[in-house]
Every structure is written in C-alpha cells, then in structure tokens.
Amino acid sequence: LFNDLPVNVYKNAITVTQQVIIKDPIPAQLYGTIEVFLGKGDEFISDVFTYEAALEGGVAVDKDAQKIVLSTVDIQKPIVACGESGTHTDSGWLKVMFLGFLGGLIALLTPCVFPMIPVTVSFFTKRSSTRKGAIKNGVIYGLFIFLIYVAASIPFHLIGNVQPEIFNNISTSAWLNVVFFVIFIFFSISFFGFFEITLPSGIASKADSKSGLGSIGGIFFMALTLAIVSFSCTGPILGSLLVGTASGGAWQLTAGLAGFGLALALPFALFAIFPNWLQSLPKSGGWLDTVKKVLAFLELALAFKFLSNADLVMHWGLLKREVFVGIWALVSIGLTLYCFGILRLPHDYKGMKITLGRKLLGVVAFLFTLYLIPGITNTKYATLKFLSGFPPPLSYSLYEHHHAKEEGLEPNVINDYNKALALSKEQNKPILIDFTGWACVNCRKMEENVWTEPEVSSYIKENFILLSLYVDDKEKLPITERFSYTTLDGNKKEIVTIGDKWATFQAENFKQVTQPLYVVLNNKEQLISNPVGYTPNITEYLSWLKCSKNGFTKQ
C-alpha cells in the first residue's frame, strides 16, 4: 500500500506543526490546505482540509485587488450598439476547418497514407460483386474515417463543460508547451529518417483482425486500422492542429479534426466512385520521402514555437525575439541545403536526382531565409509582419531599445486595472481593455499589424487609456492578493497567478475566454460598446474605436 516506505502510525488526536517561510508581504490571514490520508478500521480515506490562521502584524487584504465581478457591467446592454454582440460565438471554426483540411491533404502525401489509396480502392472493387457495391463500400469507408477523427474531439467537449477556460490553460501551460517541444523534436528526428514512430503493434493487429467482420463492422475496423497505422505520419500534423486550436475551445478542435478527416476520407470515396482516376495517380517513390523530410524541417521550426510559448509565459528569457528568428533562419537554411541535395539525410545517396519541384522549393526556402535575416537586427525592417504572432513580440528583445518597437503603442500600455481606472477619471477618457496573452498569435498580429498603423495608433493614444491584461501570465500574485473565488456558475477556483485573475475577470464579466478581446469601459466601469475580438481589418477596427469614443462622449 505504501510501496515499502516507513510510516508513523498515530491513534486518536494528533498535532502537526510546520514552519512556513513567506517572502512576500506577510498577510493578516494565512489560508492553506492539508491533504490527509487516514485509516478507520479497514477503511482508508483521503481528504483535503482548508485552514486559516491570523498572523500578528500582517498586511490586511486589499479588497480592490481581489475584485472580479463588475456589477456595473451589463453585457447585454452596452451604452452604444457597435461591435459584436455580447454573446458572440466565434465563427473562426470555418477557418480552422479549412486549415484542418489542408493538414489532411498534406497527410495524404506522406508515405504512410498515399500508397494505401490504390490498395484500398482495389480491395473494395474486387471484393464487391457489383460496381454499386464497390461505390457503397468506398463511401462508407470514407465516412468512417471522417467520423473516427471527429469522435476524437468528444473528450474535449466533456472537459470544456466542466471549465471553459481549460483550453486556454492547456495551450498556455509552460510545462505542457515544453512537453510539446520535446515531442515535436522527437517527431522531426523521426521524419528525418533516423527512426520510425509506430503505435504498439498489438493495437493495429487487433483492429486489423476485426476488419474481416460483416460488411459494416469490417469496413469500420479497416478505417480504424488506417488511422492507427498511419499515425507515424499523421501524428505530427494532428499534434500541430490540436495545439493550434486548443485555445479556441472544443468546437474549434472538432472543426479542425473534421476538416482533417474529410481530407483523408475524400480520396478513398472518390476513387471508389471513379476507379479510372487511379491511373492518373503518381506512383509511390522517392518523392514521398522528400515530402516527409520537408515536413521534418517544418516540425523542427514549430517545436521552437512551443518552447517560445513556455519562455514567454514564465519570463525565462531563453528565447528572445532575435534568438528565435535566428533559429528559424538556421532551419530554413537547412531546408534550402536539403532541397538542393547539399545536405544529405538518411536514405539519401550521393548523385541522386533532384527534381525541379524540389529545386523550386529550395529557392522558396532560400528567399524565406533572406526575409528572416533583418529580424535579427535592431532596425525598422525587423518587424517581419508576414510572420506576426509567431516570433516573440518586439518588446521581448535582446536590444534594450528596439527601433521597430517605436512604431507601436507599447510605451503607452498600462497593466494595472486600478491605475487605468484612476487615469480614466483624471483624464476623462474611456478605458480600452486589451485581454491578451503572451502565447497568443492573433494578439501579436493585432499589435504588430493594426496598432502600428499611424491612424489607429494616434487615435488610441489621444482618446483612450490603454490597459493590457495578460490572461496567461504565470507570475504569482503577492500572497496578500491570492484568494479563492467562487464563479457565477458555482465552481471554486484558486486565484494564484496574474493570469488566473485576469482570465477569470474576462470570463465572469464579458462571457468570453478567447483572446484577443477588446472592451471599452467608462470611468464608472460601465460597458460602452460590444466587445470585439480579432479584427485584422484596420478600417473596421478603427470604426469600432470611433463608435466607442462617441458613445463615451454622448453618455
């Protein structure tokens, strides 16, 4: 039971003492939890007890610092009706589904999937006594592939119903991002050809053994077998999709997996309907290995994005913007050398023929390398707007004063809500709240592509108090500002970090958990306009700002 560890056994009452060292200001009240494991007869019970203790000379809790719900905010009745509705549902799932579909098309070109198309279609054609039967079986097979990938998202819906912020917490978890970094490095080494990733053979064998069952059941297990045996190629692509959509919630995840499954399923269904098309398919060969190795370089670059996410939310300072861009430039150089046959990887050989398509890809990779190089410098050309959101922000730089950063709004940003509210009253300006995240791609795109536009930048500076609240900041709050909070839904959560506080503040008051989210309040903490999310259209965003400012003026 205790893994042979020595234990002390006590009966009846027991007093436990523990020395506690507090580096922060000492609070007037100390709250904590004790996890216990006790025996009563033959029954063993584990439980968690909370306690509180008064500390002499401690600092009293600042109630304003623990305020979450703004009673003055009515999400259904803003002062002016511009922007999105307060109960807006993100329609970005269509974009995610399209990206998932593209990921599925890429997966089709891998050595694990592509050769299966003619083999599977031929199997259905020969097995069925009529052409109609072959078409039916092929379509059912494709449908099962689609449903298998969609079904993979069901657990995430169950998790999301318990805590809506769970997806944002997952996507911004420092240690989870480090795990993904290691996994994607592992995937990329595999794609380079140094070893093969496979699921346990027993899983594939068990699914394959069921494929001989009656018509529908057999076809389902054939589809399941394909999903399992192709994992070594589809796994990295699926992993990118899962992580990329995690912060958008369960429905975006479902949309992405649906797009992926649809792309994989369509060829099997279409070739079953039109078997003559098989003759136009290119034959399997070395080009499939080339596709896999090109994907390896992409996976390697993506791995450092995950490490960067962890670095940003924890403020480790490991991957400053220039270091990150430099690593991507090295990966791009490696891809260039590979495409021209200068860099040889496992299964390549001296003198092998380099196709025109591979050479053209090498040219693209070389041009991309040239594009990245200014990103390492301290010049106005270092913005890399095409990649906005992927490298760390310009503020996270090796250079103390970055020239490219001067175009934006960063010097005017406040990160303290109470300070912003005081300035709003003092200057008679509305507060523009920017719910953002260190690991938020779309937040960086808005900051680097929209806020840097002179018209937008000057309008915000002149008319708003700009407040940026980071919902994924893992820095711990002073101990006097940590507390337990019961949400409006009745769930209890611990507010320990800066991110905990502002993520809860956003969800409770504005009923949304995605970033970026822009909210305008007046100095009475009333909602002026409907909040808006990611708005890359400069004219549309500026129009919303002007409408919000007019609403503040006319109130």
Q: Where on the chain are the PLM-derived regions?
A:
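Hydrophobic alpha-helical segments characteristic of multipass inner/organellar membrane proteins
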Residues: 68-420, 427, 452, 469
